[in-house]
Regions:
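Short S/T/G/P-rich N-terminal loop/turn motif that feeds into the first structured element of a domain
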Residues: 1-53, 60-70, 93-101
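C-terminal structural segments of small proteins and small subunits
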Residues: 66, 74-90
């Protein structure tokens, strides 16, 4: 079974309020087995536009990633983000097929 991922690009506009979102999202992330692979590290936008933060979160499955996004726990966290940040988020299924080489 393929893992699931959230890919998020975020511009934080109110850092203090955004801290509330970070605290609130921990409940949903723990429940659905989320694991941060990238969390606002150094980056270089080599093509296209970028936001100030990039986040990649891994879930045990694509369904778990969707379930987390649609959960009451994450909706409560997402509500905390309103007015604190602008985000682009996609939920994507991982790839388990053959690799080059």
């Amino acid at each position: 079974m393929s893992k699931g991922y959230w890919v998020a690009r975020v511009d934080v506009t109110d850092p203090e309020k955004y801290k509330t979102y970070i605290t609130a999202n921990a409940v949903a992330f723990a429940k659905y087995g989320a694991r941060f692979l990238v969390r606002s590290g150094a980056f270089e936008a080599v093509e296209g536009t970028a936001r100030s933060r990039n986040v990649l979160i891994e879930f045990p499955s694509y369904q778990a990633a969707l379930d987390c996004w649609n959960s009451a726990e994450y909706k409560a966290a997402r509500d905390c983000r309103v007015g604190a940040a602008t985000a682009d988020v996609i939920v994507i299924e991982g790839y388990d097929g053959p690799q080059p080489g």
